[in-house]
Amino acid sequence: VLSLSLGVRIGLKSKELLKLGQAALLHDIGMINIPHEILKKETLLTEDEWEMIKTHPLNGVKITMDLMGLSEESAQILLAILEHQKSYDGSGYPEYIKNSKISLFARIIQIADFYDAVTTPKFHNLVPMSPAEAIAYLVKHSGKLFDPLLSKHFINLLGIYPLGTLVFLTSGEWALVIGQPQDPDKLHKPVVLIIKDANGVDIPQKLVDLSQSEIDIVRADSPWKYGIDPAEYLI
């Protein structure tokens, strides 16, 4: 979804969006060859385990070629699967790829995959970043790890406080960001769902558009640190 949203944001046509969507769905298919105990390991990987993880892009290409064959239509998808762990500056893996410029689809998927991985409790990610922390990391490493233009579009797409961010308000209440303001000059004032009082006790939920309120955000944090699953409130 994030990859497609970014593709729409930069103006890709429907045919390209279809291929981008396929690439995004299949980019980690090579993980099926990685032992389950490694994928679900909750401690740091050993060097050998990490080397096994790094085989998944090439494994993914092989699996996808068996499914789709090699053609002009599948070439972009296969290249994205192969390159999605490469960074904008050429670092990352597979190490043998020395292209100075990573393919567009791979650069899009890399950003979306990074954001999803660090903000969601998954294997090897014991303390997820808050959405705001992930955005700050994107900003800091834009032009190095991440395509700077795509990063800018992605950040504008999500807003300063992306959906699911836990925010602490000047009222003392806790809230989750559930929407972005219509006014682009008020990205610091999103729509929030107040869920707890100043003591962290559940209260009747209240929807507040901060762009229309005198209440401000004091700070943002990861909801997972406080045992809050945003999906319970956003779905």
Regions found by a protein language model. Give the residues of each.
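Histidine- and acidic-residue-rich, metal-dependent catalytic cores
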Residues: 1-235
